């Protein structure tokens, strides 16, 4: 996206009326990010994002792409699925500012089984591309053949053959933050398909006090 387009988006974000913002947390988040983008143009401490379960940092994600709009922004992007890691690095190629941790966040260091989908089936269109964001360490409805209401999913047999379990390394959240020298957090994002609390529960809110949590 061009610099002019980014400036236009930031300006429009600041133009959102307070009454509208109060009706939508997502819009308040947009204004927070726009303010960060404006502040970054005048120097100061670099904006720091931590995203656990980053997927590819683009698909169905309205927050992580702001890293490209906020000058000098930095991020620790945690993503355990190899297929997603490749897409994530392609979308955020600056290795100096955007650190990818190829692990899952757990309460103890080790390895963990992740339920996921075959990368080839995603790549050739056999499976919907949105399935790249559905990997989980829990037995989510999708992985168990149930729909959003917990009832048997009639379409489960179409994608069940492409389900697989993989072993990935796991680490505690604080270890990752310390390893990457994360001293402050402006935006903290978690999307772990049913295991979100395992991550949130480890964040020291008094220490980091993120301005945005999603």
Label the model's feature ranges:
Residues 2-214:
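Phosphate/nucleotide-binding beta-alpha loop and adjacent structural elements of enzyme active sites
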């Amino acid at each position: 996206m061009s610099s002019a387009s980014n400036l236009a988006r930031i300006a429009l974000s600041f133009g959102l009326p307070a009454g509208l913002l109060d009706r939508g947390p997502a819009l308040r988040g947009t204004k927070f990010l726009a303010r960060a983008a404006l502040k970054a143009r005048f120097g100061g401490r670099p904006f720091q994002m931590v995203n656990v379960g980053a997927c590819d940092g683009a698909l169905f994600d309205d927050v992580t792409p702001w890293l490209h709009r906020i000058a000098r922004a930095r991020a620790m992007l945690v993503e355990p699925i190899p297929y997603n890691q490749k897409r994530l690095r392609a979308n955020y190629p600056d290795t100096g500012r955007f650190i990818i941790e190829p692990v899952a966040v757990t309460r103890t260091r080790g390895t963990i089984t992740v339920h996921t989908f075959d990368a080839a089936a995603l790549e050739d269109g056999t499976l919907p591309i949105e399935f790249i964001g559905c990997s989980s360490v829990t037995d989510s409805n999708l992985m168990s053949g149930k729909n959003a209401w917990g009832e048997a999913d009639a379409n489960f047999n179409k994608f069940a053959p492409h389900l697989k379990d993989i072993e990935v390394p796991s680490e505690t959240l604080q270890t990752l933050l310390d390893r990457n020298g994360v001293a402050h957090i402006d935006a903290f994002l978690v999307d772990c398909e049913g295991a979100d609390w395992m991550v949130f529960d480890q964040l020291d809110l008094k220490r980091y006090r993120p301005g945005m949590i999603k």
